[in-house]
Amino acid sequence: MEKALHRISSMNAALPDISLTDAAPGRRPLEWVGMQGIDLPVVVAEPGCRRDVHARADVQVDLPAPQVKGIHMSRLYGLLDGLADGEALSPAGLQRMLRAMVDSHRDCATRSARVRLRFDLLARRTALVTEGLAGWKAYPVRLDATLSGDAFALRAQVTVVYSSTCPCSAALSRHWIEQAFLTAFGHEARVEPTAVAAWLKRHATAATPHSQRSEAVVSVALPADGTTLGLLDLIDRVEQALGTPVQTAVKRADEQAFAVLNGGNLMFVEDAARRVQAALEDRHASPRVRVRHLESLHPHDAVAWAAPLREGADAC
């Protein structure tokens, strides 16, 4: 094997490389050049989550030298492949990799590098009520790391799926049931509790509010000197703010508890965005929120964005 690799290395040394020998015909600098959609196994250290995940990576460097025909993509690929060596992803590790990418392209006058990683964080989630019952839930994650000169920036984006019940629809449903109750019992001076209970058992769902699966996409800046990514903590904060995250394994008691949570957390899309933003702004830097309710009443979605006031709402 070593002899074969040596022969290949010797052949590469003798093979032409037009990215070095040929001049760029247009002679223009390029903002970013690189690759997208590289498959990569990475390790993510989050409590209660699977460590080994399949990621898709995008990686680029800038090409400010107008005379250089092309960058060295194999160098970027090799450095990116180092993320698969078993060390857990961290801000420091991503910064080291980007610095190495810039250093590997000094002959291109490169000053900046960036990487985007997409993967699903698989977390174990327990049932709401039933002891010993649990299941796995996947949370889409995106990491964006950029090094420009000496400035390193890292953002994490997570997607949380939850249930939303429309407050307006709930009010209309309650009104319908109220009127139906008055029609049934309004003429009576006294109503026995058992009769009320029997009526409710039969008619309490004569009108039901519409609810739907919804999603919150949250992006926050991570500290450059952080030792971990803190993804599960971010996800937990979003789910706690919303109050109705979708469940994995359930039995009837858990489904009932979920119905109670929905009834206690009626929300418009505006309510959801404000809840999440308020839960994050004291803990995370530059939180940005986008929520989407996949309306069951309409064929279109309801959406809202939130961002720090000084940044505007150009979120996620």
UniProtKB/Swiss-Prot annotation:
Q: Output the InterPro entries linked to this UniProt entry.
A: GTP_cyclohydrolase_FolE2, GTP_cyclohydrolase_FolE2/MptA
Could you tell me which cysteines form disulfide bridges? none
Q: Gene3D superfamilies under this entry?
A: Urate Oxidase
Site (May be catalytically important) location in chain: C166
Name the Gene Ontology biological process terms.
tetrahydrofolate biosynthetic process
**Pathway in which this enzyme or protein is active:** Cofactor biosynthesis; 7,8-dihydroneopterin triphosphate biosynthesis; 7,8-dihydroneopterin triphosphate from GTP: step 1/1
Q: What class of enzyme is it?
A: hydrolase
Molecular function (GO) terms for this protein are:
GTP cyclohydrolase I activity
Entry keyword Hydrolase:
yes
Keyword annotations for this protein, in alphabetical order, are: Hydrolase
Q: Which domain of life is it from?
A: Bacteria
**What does the record give as the reaction this protein catalyses?**
GTP + H2O = 7,8-dihydroneopterin 3'-triphosphate + formate + H(+)
- What EC designation does it have? 3.5.4.16
Name the family the entry cites: Belongs to the GTP cyclohydrolase IV family.
Q: What does this protein do?
A: Converts GTP to 7,8-dihydroneopterin triphosphate.
Q: What is this protein called?
A: GTP cyclohydrolase FolE2 2
